[in-house]
Regions:
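N-terminal regions that are enriched for targeting/export leaders
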Residues: 2-17
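Glycine-rich N-terminal segment of FAD-binding domains in flavoprotein oxidoreductases
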Residues: 18-121, 135-140, 364
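Short, conserved charged micro-motifs
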Residues: 34-37, 98, 212-213, 240, ...
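Short, acidic, Ser/Thr-enriched surface-loop or helix-capping motifs
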Residues: 83, 127, 157
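C-terminal substrate-binding/cap subdomain adjacent to the FAD-binding core in PCMH-type
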Residues: 151-343, 350
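Substrate-recognition/cap regions that form aromatic- and gly/pro-loop-enriched pockets
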Residues: 304-427, 431-434
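Activity-critical C-terminal alpha-helical subdomain
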Residues: 318-319, 406, 413-472
Length: 472
């Protein structure tokens, strides 16, 4: 399994496509027993393993050079559903659309139904195991990260043993595994707490950042469940990073949902993406017109979180843009206290204009404090600011992007904020420690639970080298 293969494989992430990695083999276990066998064999042969699901992770945490990839996409069953508690046990490779479809079928005709509370937005074919590893969030207005939705999990540790983890059993390991980026064990099953499935109505307005911030507490107090603020991206606009579409979702009594509601087609999305690269003002105009026209439409609280993701959408864009090289969008997510958001966004706008940052898309979401995980990114209640930046796949352009991302982290730190660790590897050591003072302890715990460092990733290797003086 671990010997050098004559036909080594090259894997890459789906979105940024900047993590091409040569690996020796890819295994696709379909049972927990097969995962245990793979880890046991890796220990015998002395090779390293990494774990992937939907392959959207873009910071290097799902691949390891010259290692063996465990692709959990075949470990995808819904094992048990408890309609009384509203809990579901699933295998880690199941992806959101499949989970939601199975829940819908199992509950067809029931007067009380359950659905997922939150998922990542912008893409759907993401695994539950990956959601656990990254401790993801959605667009809930009053929700903590995904750890709040996890009742328990089973993992295969680095020694090949099956271990049950919850807040009551192996609690320290539970805290490390959720948001632990696959370094403390291979999650094979998880029990999730669902929420009552209910209808919501979309309410949309164009407003300023200040108006959105003022309205947010009122929306939460009134029981609105979800929402976000999608801001203008044209740097020559007076509304750049300041004016946007504020969409919220309010629970309503169940009624038949119109079959012909407005929606953006794949062709609409491809056109919007093209405009976002060449005419950002027009892209926002069309996007905001669509959202305003959809005001008042009804959705289900779970399925409204699904979205269209166009696989390899940038191949067509590369031809249209004719820049002579491949390109993609790279994501960063920054967190600041809500009271600092206006100053933070103004500083980002000035920086983007000064450095000619090519911003394609951005949104503001909200998160409640995570007091449970060891490497919590939501160390307090935050506004979450997501920027998608265009990157040409050229060394100079990537170096320029790295500078952009580091400056953004510095701006977040200036306003008592933080950043998400694994969208890119460009943070400095000082930035890591400023935002994650527990990082060295996290890495030390990794080596305590996995002294052979059987489970690795290029992300882990990068930070092991960065913190080599602090680690044994």
């Amino acid at each position: 399994m671990c010997s050098k293969s004559e036909q080594a494989i090259v894997v890459n992430d789906v979105h940024a496509k900047l993590n091409a990695t040569t690996m020796q083999h890819c295994l696709q276990p379909a049972t927990v027993a097969e995962v245990i066998t793979a880890v046991t064999q890796a220990n015998k042969e002395g090779c390293v393993l990494s774990v992937a699901g939907g392959r959207h992770a873009m910071g290097g945490q799902q691949f390891v050079t010259d290692g063996v990839l465990l692709d959990l996409s075949r470990l995808n069953k819904l094992e048990h559903f408890d309609p009384e508690l509203g809990q579901v046990r699933v295998q880690a490779g199941i992806q959101w659309p499949d989970l939601m479809r199975k829940l819908h079928v199992m509950q067809y005709g029931n007067s009380r139904q359950w659905g997922i509370r939150q998922k990542q937005t912008g893409a759907d074919r993401l695994s539950i195991g990956g959601a656990i590893a990254a401790n993801i969030h959605g667009r809930g207005l009053d929700m903590a990260p995904f750890v709040a939705d996890i009742v328990s999990l089973n993992l295969v540790n680095a020694q090949g043993q099956l271990v049950h983890c919850s807040r009551q059993q192996n609690a320290e390991l539970f805290r490390l595994v959720v948001g632990g980026y696959g370094l403390f064990g291979i999650v094979v099953t998880a029990t999730l707490q669902l929420a009552a499935r209910q209808q919501v109505v979309r309410e949309v307005e164009l407003c300023s950042l200040a108006e959105m911030i003022a309205a947010l507490p009122q929306r939460i107090a009134a029981g609105y469940l979800y929402g976000d603020f999608q801001f203008e991206t044209a740097p020559d606009s007076a509304g750049f990073l300041w004016h946007g579409v504020f969409s919220c979702y309010r629970p309503v009594a169940t009624e038949p949902i119109a079959k012909q509601q407005l929606r953006l087609s794949k062709a609409n999305w491809q056109q919007l993406l093209y405009l976002a690269h060449i005419d950002k003002a027009e892209a926002f105009s069309r996007f905001s017109q669509f959202y305003l026209a959809s005001n008042g439409q009804r959705y289900w609280s779970d399925s409204h979180q699904l979205s269209i993701y166009l696989d390899d959408y940038h191949l067509a864009l590369d031809q249209q843009l004719a820049r002579g090289c491949a390109g993609s969008e790279m994501i960063t997510e920054l967190y600041v206290p809500l009271q600092a958001l206006q100053h933070f966004m103004a500083a980002c706008a000035a920086d983007f204009r000064q450095h000619k940052v090519d911003l394609i898309y951005g949104t503001v979401r909200f998160i409640r404090r995570d007091a449970e995980t060891a490497l919590a990114w939501a160390r307090q209640d935050y506004a979450c600011v997501i920027f998608n930046l265009h990157i040409d796949h050229l060394p100079e352009a990537i170096n320029t992007a790295a500078s952009h991302f580091r400056r953004l982290i510095d701006i977040a730190i200036r306003y008592q904020g933080c950043y998400f660790l694994t969208y890119h590897p460009f943070a400095t050591k000082q930035q890591v420690l400023a935002c994650y003072p527990q990082f060295v302890e996290f890495m030390q715990q990794k080596r305590r639970y996995d002294p052979a460092q059987r489970l690795q990733s290029n992300w882990y290797r990068h930070y092991s080298e960065m913190f080599s003086e602090e680690l044994p």
